[in-house]
Regions:
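Short, structured secondary-structure boundary patches
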Residues: 3-9, 15, 77-83, 159-165, ...
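Short, composition-biased local secondary-structure segments
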Residues: 7-18, 96-101, 152-155
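A structural alpha-helix within SAM-dependent methyltransferase catalytic domains
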Residues: 20-24, 46, 50, 88, ...
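Short, basic, helix/turn surface patches
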Residues: 82-92, 168-170, 223-229
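Helical "substrate-binding/catalytic lid" subdomain
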Residues: 106-226
Length: 229
């Protein structure tokens, strides 16, 4: 079995650690990273923050610029309940109902788990579209069957027209970021002894976008890759 491709030391966690270190003594200030990072990376950043005399609350989000502008991001916080309660009013500016999911590391794990679904759902929907089109099934007929079923996910309609038109510009979340997060998930899964080999093919497919114009485009550009053999 070939080894899993994984990611360590994400740019988000490395940059955040450098910024926190440069601040020096924190005097009970609270560090709230909101990007995607590994569980161990977040825990290490929490320990660093505490050594510098600060408090730590990881608060990664699901959503992008439109949700940020309307205060409807989904916030999944990890850290002490007391720190979460202290920062709730701030988080309420970004999310209608920010949630504390557990201690430090749990927010990071939740975010990675959700972003894995972005890759999995986009890939599976793209393959299904490719197959029914090759078989001559009208796309709308396929969607009429899919939409009322338990298999439907709203992201399918959100990305359908982009996939059909091959229009991947103006991204809210890029292909390169999706690849980075999927590799991060694979690393966390390996650390936990989970069997995630089935996702390796998706990661390999996303690697094909590296150093191409697809890398900075919307992540549904994955559809352009499923049409290649």
């Amino acid at each position: 079995m070939p080894p899993l491709q994984t990611a360590r030391g994400t740019p988000t966690s490395t940059a955040t650690a450098a910024v926190v270190e440069a601040l020096g003594p924190l005097h009970r200030a609270t560090v709230i990273p909101m990007g995607t990072m590994g569980v161990g990376e977040s825990q290490a950043l929490a320990a660093q923050t505490e050594r510098q005399g600060g408090q730590y609350l990881e608060a990664p989000v699901l959503g992008s610029q439109p949700q940020a502008l309307t205060g409807t991001l989904l916030v999944m916080a990890g850290g002490d309940q007391e720190v979460f309660d202290q920062q709730r009013s701030l988080l309420n500016q970004l999310a209608e109902a920010p949630q504390r999911v557990g201690p430090v590391g749990s927010g990071a794990a939740t975010k990675i788990a959700l972003n894995q679904l972005i890759a999995s759902l986009t890939h599976s929907f793209s393959l299904s579209l490719r197959l029914i089109q090759q078989a001559g099934v009208p796309v709308e007929t396929f969607m009429d069957i899919l939409r009322p079923s338990a298999l439907y996910a709203p992201t399918f309609d959100k990305k359908l027209q982009r996939m059909l038109d091959g229009h991947y510009s103006d991204p809210n979340f890029s292909t390169s970021l999706l690849r980075k997060d999927l590799l991060l998930f694979l690393q966390e899964a390996a650390d936990q002894g989970l069997q995630a080999q089935g996702l390796q093919g998706v990661a390999d497919l996303l690697m094909q976008a590296k150093d191409t114009e697809l890398d900075d485009q919307d992540y549904c550009a994955l559809h352009a890759l499923t049409g290649q053999s």
